[in-house]
Amino acid sequence: MIKGVGIDSIEVERVKKIIDKGDLFAKKVLTPNEFAQYQKLEGKRKVEYLGGRFSLKESFSKAMGTGLGKSVGFQDIETLWDDLGHPVMTSTKFDGNIFPSITHDNHEIITFVVLEEK
């Protein structure tokens, strides 16, 4: 049974400005595993990665019906790549199946998350 659906977007230019200020935001939003992947990236891929992970976490929290805050925090949600480069999302706050989707172009990063109860 579907528990929830969440969608979010963020402007690429906004993410670029955040990255230009240093790693403080990335360290707040990304788990240690995500941050390790992030540090290996450069340029456009770095922007897509940070913006995508932030937006996916927003989408997840919307699907949970909580938003980000006391109930669900950035460190409670992790999205890494599988062997084929697909996003695989896990969370300490949800025990069901999580289906993330992400797309981006030169202007916008859009994410979608479906939560399915076991």
UniProtKB/Swiss-Prot annotation:
Keywords: Cytoplasm, Fatty acid biosynthesis, Fatty acid metabolism, Lipid biosynthesis, Lipid metabolism, Magnesium, Metal-binding, Transferase. This is Holo-[acyl-carrier-protein] synthase. Coiled coil: none annotated. It catalyses: apo-[ACP] + CoA = holo-[ACP] + adenosine 3',5'-bisphosphate + H(+). Signal peptide: none annotated. Pfam families: ACPS (PF01648). It is an enzyme of class 2 (transferase). Its cofactor is Mg(2+). GO terms for cellular component: cytoplasm. Gene3D superfamilies: 4'-phosphopantetheinyl transferase domain. It is found in: Cytoplasm. GO terms for molecular function: holo-[acyl-carrier-protein] synthase activity; magnesium ion binding. Belongs to the P-Pant transferase superfamily. AcpS family.
